[in-house]
Amino acid sequence: MKRITAALLCLAMLALFFGCGRESTEEGLAGIVQTGSLELAFAQGFSVDEYEDGLKLISIKDGGRFLVVPEGAQIPSGIPGDVTVLRQPLKNIYLAATAAMCLFDGLGRLDAIGLSGTKAEGWYVENARLAMERGEILYAGKYSEPDYELILGAGCPLAIESGMIGHAADVMNKLVELGVPVLIDRSSYEPHPLGRTEWIKLYGALLGEEEKANELFNEQRALMESAVNGEKSGKTAAFFRISPSGYAVARKTGDYVSRMIELAGGRYAFSDLVGEGGATATVNVEMEKFFSTAREADVVIYNSTIGGEVSTLEEFLALNPLLAELKAVQNGAVWCTRESMYQQTLNIGRMIKELNTIFSCGADETPELQYFFRLK
C-alpha cells in the first residue's frame, strides 16, 4: 500500500510539474493577462501576443522573443531570460535587412531608422535613398562589417538583420555583447509569397502602427486574390537570368517567384528544378538543359535584379544568340523585371496581379506595369 501511495504521489507531482510547464508556455508571460493574438493569414515565421497595458510579445521562429513596452508603461517583473525588452518609441534602428525597408516606408516610419546596412545608391526605395542623401539615415556598414562605434554612438536600441547574419554569427554576438539586441527578419523563408508581405504586421506591432499595417497588407491580399480569381491562362513562364559565366540561373520550384507565377494563373517552366538542397533559392542550369526546358515556354521573364536591366530585345539576345530560338522570343512575349523588384516586399500582391496581366495580354499589347516591362 505504501508503494502504491508513493507511486500515486509521484505521478501527481509529475502531473503538477508538467501541467505548470504547459500553462506557462501557453501564456507566454507568467502573471500577465493575455488579451489576444495578432491574426495572421500566411506568415508562419513569427507571432505577436497581446497583453494588458499594451504589452506585445513578438516571437520569431528561431529568432528570439521581444517584449514591446509602450512609452510610459512599466516593465513587468519576472520576464523570462530569453525575452528582450524593447521600449517604444524606437529610434535609430540599424536596418541591415534590405527587404524590410519598404515596410517601414509603407508605414510612414522611416523616422525610426537611423542607420542603414545599405548605401544610398543601393536603395530602390526612393524615400530611403533620399533620407540617406539628406543625412537623416546614416550608412553604418553592411551586415557582416558594421560600424560598431557609429552604432553605439547613435544609441541604437535594435539591429534588424536578415537571415544572412547566420553567416556572420560573430557579428551578431558582438552586437549583443555591446548591448544592441538583434532581431532577425526571416520573411524570405516564408513559404507563401504574401507571407513575406505580412511581416509588415510585425513591424506595425514594433512601432505601434498595427492599423496601418493591416490596411496595407489587406490591399496586397486583395490584389493577389483578384489575380487568383481571374483568368487562368495556363501559360508556361521561364524566369531566369544569364550569369557572367554563361549559365542560366533559375529559381527552384517552390520558391516564392515560382509560387507567384502559379498564383497569377501561369505555370513555372522549371517545375522539376529542385537543385541539390541548401538555402539558396537559385540553381545554375547548363544552357543545353535550359534550352530544352525553356524552348517552348509561352512567356520569358528576364530577371534583371542582380546583373542589371536589359532595356531592349537586342540586348537580351546579345546574352546568348540561341535565345532567339525560344518560342516566346519569336512570339514577342519577352519581359524583364525592374531592378527594384526584390526590395519591394510590400508590393508582392501587385507583382502577382501584374504577372496575371502579362499572362493574359496579347502580343500587340504593352500594359504599363510597375515591376515588369516588355522587351522590344
Regions inferred by a protein language model and the residue ranges of each:
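Bacterial N-terminal signal peptides
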Residues: L8-L16
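Flexible, glycine-rich surface segments
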Residues: N229-S311
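Positively charged n-region of N-terminal signal peptides that target proteins for export
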Residues: M1-L8
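Soluble non-cytosolic domains of exported or imported proteins
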Residues: R87, G141-P146, S162-A169, E190-T197, ...
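Structured C-terminal subdomain patch of bacterial secreted/periplasmic proteins
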Residues: S187-N218, V299-K376
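Extracytoplasmic ligand-binding site segments that recognize negatively charged/polar headgroups
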Residues: K91, T98-F104, S116-N127, H167-D170, ...
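Bacterial Sec-exported substrate-binding components of ABC uptake systems
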Residues: C20-M101, K212-F239, A363-K376
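A short, structured surface patch at a secondary-structure boundary
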Residues: I60, F66-L152, L158-I165
